[in-house]
Amino acid sequence: CSHIAAGEHPISLDAQTRDSLQSQADRLACRGLRVLAVAVRRHCDGWQSLDNGQLESALEFVGLLALMDPPRAEVPAAIAACREAGIKVTMVTGDSGLTAEAIARQIGLLDPRESPPGNPVADPVRVIHGDDLARLSDVQLRQLLRFRSRLVFARMTPEQKLRLVQSYRSLGEVVGVTGDGVNDAPALRAADVGIAMGCSGTDVAREAADIVLLDDNFATIVDAVRHGRAVVANIGRFLTYVIASNVAEMAPFVAMVALQIPAALTVLQILAVDLGTDLLPALGLGAEPPEPGLMRQPPRRRGAPLLNRSVLLRAYLVLGLSEAVVSMGAYLLLLDRGGRQASTLTFALIVAGQMGALLACRSASLPFWQRLRVPNRLFWLGLLSEPLIAALLVLIPPLAAVFSMEPLPRPWLGWLPLAPLAVLLADTLHKGSLRWWRQRQTASGMVSPPSSRLSRANR
């Protein structure tokens, strides 16, 4: 612009006035407003034949237009939840640096205490403009992304958004990208998870994305992460419970070979446990509500197996071994008094031990009593079904004949509470020792707190 529009006689735009207008625009941008400068050109006959440079010359400045597009009220809490969950949020926008920084402070991505409010200078450490990014080599960009958090990239082109996604992925990070415009499509396609806006998003963005948000709400992504983590945790509970009985089921055959004694269980009795008494309880564990503190845990490593070492050790050496010791101990002590009844007691003790394992498996870290009041109808129905199914197999003569079982003498029933008590005691000691070890490792600096282990999500 060379002049300021003022009726029929435009005023010349000098350097001092230009600086004053720029300061006003910066102050508006510092409030998180998107600022547009409006100008006109007079006497533009034959404009169709002019190029862009000619059209954008000799303009008269009309005024500044500020647009407000405030973030949703839920976004600051969602950003804080991401930080607790170890998810690194990076803002990538086409807005100016001052506007982007102001919005980043409003949503809690940048700390408002790091810069005085209304300061018309974008933080060069946290806010990177497109021109600055273009001057960075790939190595420098990866170093920036690796060692800097809570970054804001302003005035980004589609190519630069794509470059950021590729750089994050080259660091081994799992990258999620949100976008709504055509210029976001390359980054959405290149990300591990592309998330398009369902209400305001373009057809191109929705086609390029993997997920479409129907409510255009960033907080919905955090809820999805929480439910996803809950599903993974429930799979771990399910697997731990299901394989816990394997040790107690294998122990009779090991003892049969080693001690030359009759097997404590028949094949049908093992199937009765695996396909009968364990089925509904396992489904109940799959429906467990999310555990408190789930979003304060670090993200899972990419490619980490669901059936990992901690699950196997806990299932076999803690829960399963406890069941095996009690069930085989009772069988060896009572074998001489009645073979089929001793076998029935072994079966009943494994079922009782699985009831204790069911209570223990509701959490991988909390003592079982801290989850007793958590509502889950399917879980409690499964817990009640175990002794009921076992009693039907033992007390109904046709079923007892098929499964080679007999009713137990009343004095032998005193063995049954020992199995769940042993399992719960062993699991409580195991969880306590793990908590003590982790606290010791964290205090000594050998293990970083979960909040410092970050996975990246690009926005």
PLM region descriptions:
Residues 28, 38, 59, 82, ...:
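Residue-level signature of catalytic and energy-coupling elements of molecular machines
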Residues 115, 120-176, 191, 196-368:
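Membrane-embedded transport module
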Residues 354-358, 390, 423-432:
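Alpha-helical transmembrane segments
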Residues 429-442:
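Membrane-interface capping segments at transmembrane-helix boundaries
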